[in-house]
């Protein structure tokens, strides 16, 4: 399914939040600054529906994002996991590996929307995580294996694994003024791949938020058996005072060789308020 998910990401990038010379909507009224801190909660539920391999995983994370430095072209941010819980019907041993990230500071470079680019000091992060693995009770052979697996990951995959929620937030945090309305990427087929996507933008009545939604569908008819299909729906509320999302929900449904439903919800806690006019 890797190739199909790459097509999903391509479809998302193809339907960019549109610009317009007139009637544009603000997306960020105050610039990012060093010292900014925001608290988020992330809730994920994944159900694998393949016969004979059914499973369910539920996790909840609470984390803080601090701006360490801000420039027009990008940010330096710090991610700190504050609390975590996880249940997995097929692998109950995953929760300690997640909980070991609690308290580990992860500084990273990001683009202007907050999308992670690279970790600033992976060796320090690795060593802090190793100490936490010992603190949560993993024996030495298990620690060696977990750290070895992390060490051999490509840098981009490691960033995605640790900071996946940040990428979801950044997907819905445009840094250019946008135009209200509905915008479609027409259905198109290239070889075995067929895809379509839709984006809509509308202002909130209070003047402090924007509602953004993205829907896309990608089908791969190549190979034997049924076609692989991915459908993804994302809805979010952007707090235009600071340009960061107050809530994002993404539902991804796959069918074909892999059958699953994943729902991810990330929201700020406490929710940002609208300044009195």
For each of these PLM feature ranges, what is it?
Residues 4-10:
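Hydrophobic helical h-region of N-terminal Sec-dependent signal peptides
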Residues 12-15:
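C-terminal segment of classical bacterial N-terminal signal peptides
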Residues 17-110, 168-277:
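Acidic, serine/threonine-rich low-complexity disordered tracts
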Residues 113-213:
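Solvent-exposed helix/loop surface patches that form functional interfaces
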């Amino acid at each position: 399914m890797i190739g199909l998910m790459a097509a999903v990401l391509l479809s998302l990038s193809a339907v960019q939040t549109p610009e317009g010379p007139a009637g544009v909507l603000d997306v960020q009224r105050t610039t990012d600054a060093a010292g900014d801190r925001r608290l988020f909660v992330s809730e994920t539920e994944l159900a694998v529906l393949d016969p004979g391999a059914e499973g369910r995983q539920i996790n909840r994370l609470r984390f803080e994002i601090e701006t360490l430095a801000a420039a027009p072209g990008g940010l330096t941010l710090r991610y700190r996991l504050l609390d975590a819980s996880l249940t997995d019907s097929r692998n109950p041993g995953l929760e300690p590996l997640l909980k070991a990230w609690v308290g580990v500071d992860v500084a990273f470079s990001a683009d202007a929307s907050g999308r992670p680019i690279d970790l600033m000091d992976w060796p320090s992060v690795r060593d802090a995580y190793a100490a936490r693995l010992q603190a949560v009770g993993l024996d030495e052979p298990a620690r060696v294996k977990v750290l070895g697996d992390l060490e051999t990951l490509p840098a981009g995959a490691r960033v995605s694994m640790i900071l996946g929620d940040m990428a979801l937030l950044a997907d819905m945090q445009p840094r250019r003024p946008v135009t209200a309305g509905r915008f479609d990427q027409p259905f198109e087929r290239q070889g075995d791949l067929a895809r379509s996507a839709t984006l809509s933008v509308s202002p909130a009545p209070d003047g402090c938020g924007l509602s953004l939604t993205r829907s896309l569908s990608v089908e791969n008819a190549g190979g034997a058996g049924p076609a692989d299909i991915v459908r993804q729906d994302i809805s979010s509320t952007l707090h235009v005072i600071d340009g960061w999302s107050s809530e994002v929900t993404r539902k991804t449904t796959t069918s074909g060789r892999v059958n699953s439903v994943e729902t991810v919800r990330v929201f700020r806690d406490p929710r940002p308020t609208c300044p009195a006019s």
